[in-house]
Amino acid sequence: MLDNQTIATVKSTIPLLSATGPKLTAHFYERMFKHNPELKNIFNMSHQLNGDQREALFNAICAYAANIDNLKVLLPAVEKIAHKHASLNIQPEHYQIVGTHLLATLNEMFQPGNEILDAWGKAYGVLADIFINREEQIYHSGELTDGGWRGLRPFRINRKEVKSEVICSFEFAPQDGGKVMDYKPGQYLSIYLQDDSFANREIRQYSLTAAPNGSSYRIAIKREPQGIVSNHMHDKMQEGDTVWLTAPRGDFFLDIKPETPVTLISAGVGLTPMMSMLYHLHQQNHNSPINWLHAAEHGGHHAFSHEVAAIAQAMPNFAGTIWYREPRDEDQQGIHYQHKGFMDLTVLNEALKTEGMHFYFCGPVAFMQYVAKQLLDMGIDKQFIHYECFGPHKVI
């Protein structure tokens, strides 16, 4: 535990940190990658270029300083980050490297003196121990689970299937022929790739898109115009090729009782964790109302529509509503989609106000902000709202 003087000293730096903004974390990452370039094989360097990771780390540092005397407030964020770290196979020695560069960054930017540096050193040590212990629990639990493993495991691509003009699904089976551990609906895999065309090893997280079966995993990947990994997977990786995976991770998953009504909301490739949730509900014979709301650019970008339709036929409590922003001539309203334009939840006002209904959603950040605002404006309590960001976490 931290003493009162250390807590007060760390809190005294909040105005300085806030005034500096993400310049602090930009300096930190630049320094760390210069002195420890091997870490480029762990971090998603695309998020370094667009600034998302710098902003996320800056927000995390400020949140830690502000709540250092009440760490329970940070537990949800710790859980999310710990799962992400476990998917990246982060080890205790990585925390020592990060701590060294964090303190050096504070010293180089502010020259705050030994008292502040010592306080931040103690504070970082406490936080690092929290993460190290939680991540070890995640690793150990995975090892003990039937079909589980620690670290990386080689898989082969069993099946590659086009799901839309921009989305391909990939089914992986372990090369050792063994079982694979179950996962919670909404969780993700990390895929590790190395290629001569890459500057570094690349690691990406992709949501699982089916129900657990003990023998294989399925994900879906959207081709991003500048995406190093997504284009490689779409264009280069074929059935029979090898990839390396860490075990399923993630703190965003369906967690409701059988009698709970639920609405699954998505846009674009954000439907991938919802597919896993929908298959789970079908597998469990969920008999309470299920609303499936999805937004796509048009029919050519609408993935998994046939799979969802098949599940819908088997579940009388299922109600699907689709929005196409710009339907093509061949997209038929009432058959392929119900509404044109952006997702307007007021058309389902009464259905969404079912008592005790939970809402899970995923998609582009602007879409999720738009959805969250509509739900809150309807009077939906925050405790019933759950969401997942692809990439560094943002508060919606």
UniProtKB/Swiss-Prot annotation:
SUPFAM superfamilies: Ferredoxin reductase-like, C-terminal NADP-linked domain, Globin-like, Riboflavin synthase domain-like. It holds the Pfam family FAD_binding_6. NCBIfam families: PRK13289.1. The record marks Y29 as: Involved in heme-bound ligand stabilization and O-O bond activation. PROSITE patterns: FAD_FR, GLOBIN. Keywords: Detoxification, FAD, Flavoprotein, Heme, Iron, Metal-binding, NAD, NADP, Oxidoreductase, Oxygen transport, Transport. GO terms for molecular function: FAD binding; heme binding; metal ion binding; nitric oxide dioxygenase NAD(P)H activity; oxygen binding; oxygen carrier activity. Belongs to the globin family. Two-domain flavohemoproteins subfamily. In the C-terminal section; belongs to the flavoprotein pyridine nucleotide cytochrome reductase family. The keyword Heme applies. Gene3D superfamilies: Globins (1.10.490.10), Nucleotide-binding domain of ferredoxin-NADP reductase (FNR) module (3.40.50.80), Translation factors (2.40.30.10). Transmembrane segments: none annotated. Residues 147-396 are annotated as: Reductase. Residues 1-136 form the Globin domain. Is involved in NO detoxification in an aerobic process, termed nitric oxide dioxygenase (NOD) reaction that utilizes O(2) and NAD(P)H to convert NO to nitrate, which protects the bacterium from various noxious nitrogen compounds. Therefore, plays a central role in the inducible response to nitrosative stress. It comes from Photorhabdus laumondii subsp. laumondii (strain DSM 15139 / CIP 105565 / TT01). InterPro entries: Cbr1-like_FAD-bd_dom, FAD-bd_FR_type, Flavoprot_Pyr_Nucl_cyt_Rdtase, FNR_nucleotide-bd, Globin, Globin-like_sf, Globin/Proto, Hmp. Its EC number is 1.14.12.17. The active site is at Y95 (charge relay system), E135 (charge relay system). This is Flavohemoprotein. The record marks K84, E388 as: Influences the redox potential of the prosthetic heme and FAD groups. It is an enzyme of class 1 (oxidoreductase).
